[in-house]
Amino acid sequence: AVYGRQIVAVPLRRPGLRQLAPPRLFATGQVRAEAIPARVQALVAQGRPVLVGVDTVAEAQALSARLNAAGIDHQVLDARHDADEAAVVAMAGQAGTVTVATRMAGRGTDIELGAGVAERGGLHVLCCQDNASARLDRQCIGRAARQGDPGSAEVWHALDASIWQSGGASVGLLRRRQQEGPGALAVPA
């Protein structure tokens, strides 16, 4: 009970169809950033729209430069482009569309799927935010598979992010395992 009140779970209006992949851990934010274009390209090749969630405007701009270098068309939704928000969100669910967004695409942002996208698996969300709050992770992931549509999401963490610096023994173990091989570690959810 919160504030002395009972809590009631409100069921979904339609069954949830989101597929959540196991989280991936990367040695550094740099290694993670280098891996994003290949993942995005693979999803776009399937005809799926992709939303990549990042923490800051600077990260959005850096990722935009990486995607440009890889020849991947995309839109950026951040505080610098807030006047275009409605147009970017309206296009974000179209087949093969890539959107890079800061937390502006969080709670309350409903990305509608374009023609044929549901049959291809729906919107895929790649959450590359290292949030101290699980609520913010859920908001990012929650952009996929809304209103009974199919969709998928995955969370990619960078072990050099500030949230991991005070994590104790479990983070220390992950760091030691990460040193055994470069790049990403897949860990069970």
Question: At which residue positions do the language-model features occur?
Answer:
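Conserved phosphate/anionic-ligand binding catalytic regions in large, soluble enzymes, centered on
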Residues: A1, G93-E112, R135-H157
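Conserved nucleotide-binding/hydrolysis micro-motifs of P-loop NTPases
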Residues: R13-L17, T56-E59, H81-A83, M104-G108, ...
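C-terminal helicase module of SF1/SF2 nucleic-acid helicases/translocases
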Residues: V117-A189
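Conserved interdomain hinge at the start of the Helicase C-terminal
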Residues: L20-L51
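Interdomain helical connector at the RecA1-RecA2 junction of SF1/SF2 helicase-like NTPases
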Residues: A1-A27
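Flexible beta-alpha connector loops of hexameric P-loop NTPases
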Residues: L20-R32, H74-A83, L126
